[in-house]
UniProtKB/Swiss-Prot annotation:
Homology family: Belongs to the UvrC family.
A Pfam entry, by short name: UvrC_RNaseH_dom
Keywords, in A-Z order: Cytoplasm, DNA damage, DNA excision, DNA repair, Excision nuclease, SOS response
Gene3D superfamilies noted in UniProt: 5' to 3' exonuclease, C-terminal subdomain (1.10.150.20), GIY-YIG endonuclease (3.40.1440.10), UVR domain (4.10.860.10), UvrC, RNAse H endonuclease domain (3.30.420.340)
Protein name per Swiss-Prot or TrEMBL: UvrABC system protein C
Cell location: Cytoplasm
InterPro entries: GIY-YIG_endonuc, GIY-YIG_endonuc_sf, GIY-YIG_UvrC_Cho, Hlx-hairpin-Hlx_DNA-bd_motif, RuvA_2-like, UVR_dom, UVR_dom_sf, UvrABC_protein_C
High-level lineage: Bacteria, Pseudomonadati, Pseudomonadota, Gammaproteobacteria, Oceanospirillales
Gene coding for it: uvrC
Quaternary structure note: Interacts with UvrB in an incision complex.
Species per Swiss-Prot/TrEMBL record: Hahella chejuensis (strain KCTC 2396)
GO biological process, one term: nucleotide-excision repair
The protein's role, per its UniProt record: The UvrABC repair system catalyzes the recognition and processing of DNA lesions. UvrC both incises the 5' and 3' sides of the lesion. The N-terminal half is responsible for the 3' incision and the C-terminal half is responsible for the 5' incision.
């Protein structure tokens, strides 16, 4: 049986590229469900929507898909690395269920206080340990090659802590010049820290900075007549210069942000491709619906100004920015980078070689994103029209609002109101209502309070009333809405109750329509029903998120704030020390006594509050 989904897979797949890349599957809330890579995007994504041969887990994923975003890459290897970075950043829930058991090779910098090590690690999505990870690398061989080079240049230890702690004399690595033997004190912590700092900079691709610093340290060592140390530093400089020359020959990229622009009459897409040390670590499409600038150079300049100075640059400021069009205020932007960040950033649009390839890739992704978004908007408009037709409504319907109530056995009751128009959600008009002074678990009175608070203000405001109000519930909730509107003397708004079927499965909903007191059951594959489900599910998400926040806040406050002698300062000290109320609850009396500013008497009072 074909899975029910609000996503129009057929239209999406029709225009999907066959090139390699990464795909991100998202639900109706815009949250990423799953990230995957593909040698052929069209073939791979199509496989999820087959009618046969699909696992139960995959079918459950497909039922939740509301949108799919893609990023085109040069190769499958590049797609693999980008996939891993996105999984690490986004932590999609279905990747735990659907990804294979493959792990990726990293270089791991340990957290040892004086003498940290660099070692080979294979890790999955959640990396353990307090140290720092560099990677992922394309292969284990690439990691081992990098580690061998780091040993040769910086002589950083690569042994395990247990081996390091039990040495009484240097090992073979020291004898062949690949370790400075910190285990037996043949290098002081300060010198080792300098070598480790340079090794870290090397992994970050900052070779010119290392060379300059090392030359300065070599000159200082010579002036202090420490010729042995000076010779070691001289060899490091020689190695680094050779590596730098080799990288220049191979065309290894610096840290680059590549931006491309694609536009239609109604929509502009700017796609950013983020390259760090020669690898694509991320990408993102930005949609600009209102175009005030007529020139592409003006538009991209305005966008970059907001992107870098508005705290949107999640990968930081790069060494270089490349764009598909020349920026009208390039010099002003470079001067602003220098003034605000004290960084000299190169900005170019006429580029060659690797930079041209990155820019071409960004342009390909921008074009694809524009095509997908325009098709998505067309599909949304079609769903809206289907919704109006199915309910025999006029085409002039511009706004639908939907309400839901969420609580846990009457605790922290919150009602939500979400707003949709022909082009989708209008999140600026969303509202939550913390319900007060109603019997615990009484959804009817909670809905009455939310509707009264919403429309007693809205009926006289500039925003105006919606055309349709959806109530998540059957005749009972719809009756409450009628009662509120009669009391507020509001007319001209169509009220619709959305009741789940007996099985409570999507596709079995019953609609109670107030305009003519009719009852409507739409078929499960109806695009009108898909839109109603999308709006209702969004109202549910918005309500339950608000409820959980209120519940957690209430539970956090109720225990600590009720303890005699605990004011704002002591409460803050306790939370800073333990990290959470749950950890305070788990703590022993002796552990509570150790908190600065908490006396033995207060500690006993706190412990008793949680355990009696």
């Amino acid at each position: 049986m074909e899975s029910q989904s609000i996503f129009d897979a057929k239209s999406f797949l029709k225009q999907l590229t066959t090139r390699p890349g990464v795909y991100r599957m998202m639900d109706a809330r815009g949250e990423v469900l799953y990230v995957g890579k593909a040698r052929n995007l069209k073939n791979r994504v199509s496989s999820y929507f087959r009618n046969t041969g699909v696992s139960i887990k995959t079918r459950a994923l497909v039922e939740k898909i509301a949108d799919i975003e893609i990023t085109i890459t040069h190769s499958e290897t590049e797609a693999l690395l980008l996939e891993q970075n996105l999984i690490k950043t986004l932590k999609p829930p279905y990747n735990i269920l659907l990804r294979d058991d493959k792990s990726y090779p990293y270089i791991y910098l340990s957290s040892h206080d004086e003498y940290p090590s660099l070692t080979f690690r294979r890790v999955r999505q959640k990396k353990t340990g307090k140290g720092r990870f560099f990677g992922p690398y394309t292969s284990a061989a690439a990691v081992r090659e990098s580690l061998a080079l780091l040993q040769k240049i910086f002589r950083i230890r690569q042994c395990e802590d247990s081996f390091f702690s039990n040495r009484s004399r240097p090992c073979l690595q020291h004898q062949i010049g690949r370790c400075s033997a910190p285990c037996v004190g043949l290098i002081d912590p300060q010198s080792y820290a300098e070598d480790m700092s340079h090794a870290t900079m090397f992994l970050e691709g900052r070779n010119p900075e290392i060379i300059n610093e090392t030359i300065q340290q070599m000159e200082v060592a010579s002036a202090q007549l420490d010729f042995e140390r000076a010779a070691v530093l001289r060899d490091q400089v020689d190695y680094l210069r050779r590596v730098q020359e080799q990288q220049a020959i191979e065309g290894v990229a610096r840290d680059i942000d590549a931006f491309a622009l694609s536009s239609s009459l109604e929509l502009v897409v700017v796609h950013g491709l983020f390259i760090r040390a020669g690898r694509v670590v991320g990408s993102k499409s930005f949609y600009l619906s209102e175009r005030l600038e007529s020139d592409d150079g003006d538009l991209l300049s305005s966008f970059l100004n907001q992107y870098y100075f508005g705290e949107h640059a999640i990968y930081g400021l790069p060494q270089e920015i490349t764009t598909t069009v020349g920026l009208t205020d390039k010099d002003a932007l470079k001067a602003a980078f220098k003034e605000v960040f004290n960084r000299n950033v190169r900005i170019e649009h006429n580029v060659r070689s690797n930079r041209a390839e990155w820019l071409h890739l960004a342009q390909t992704n921008a074009n694809q994103a524009l095509s997908t978004r325009m098709q998505s908007q067309d599909a949304q408009l079609q769903r809206w029209q289907s919704f109006c037709d199915a309910l025999n409504l006029e085409a002039s319907v511009k706004r639908v609002e939907c309400f839901d109530v969420s609580h846990t056995f009457g605790e922290a009751t919150v009602a939500s109101c979400v707003v949709f128009g022909p082009e989708g959600a209008i999140k600026d008009l969303y509202r939550r209502y913390n319900i007060k002074d109603v019997p615990a678990g009484d959804d009817y009175h909670a809905m009455e309070q939310a509707l009264t608070r919403r429309y007693s203000k809205l009926k006289d405001s500039d925003v105006g009333l919606p055309d349709i109000i959806l109530i998540d519930g059957g005749k009972g909730q719809l009756g409450i809405a009628h009662q509120v509107f009669d009391e507020l003397q509001i007319t001209g708004v169509t009220l619709i109750g959305v009741a789940k079927g007996v099985t409570r499965k999507p596709g079995m909903e019953t609609l109670f329509i107030s305009a003519d007191n009719s009852i409507l059951n739409l078929p499960g594959d109806s695009t009108a029903l898909h839109l109603i489900q999308q709006i209702r599910d969004e109202a549910h998400r918005f309500a339950i998120t608000g409820h959980r926040n209120q519940r957690n806040k209430k539970r956090t406050q109720s225990v600590l704030d009720a303890v005699p002698g605990i004011g704002p300062k002591r409460r803050r000290d306790l939370l800073n020390y333990f990290g959470s109320v749950r950890n305070i609850e788990r703590a022993s009396l002796e552990e509570i006594k150790r908190v600065p500013g908490i006396s033995e008497v207060i500690a006993q009072t706190i412990y008793a509050a949680f355990h009696e």
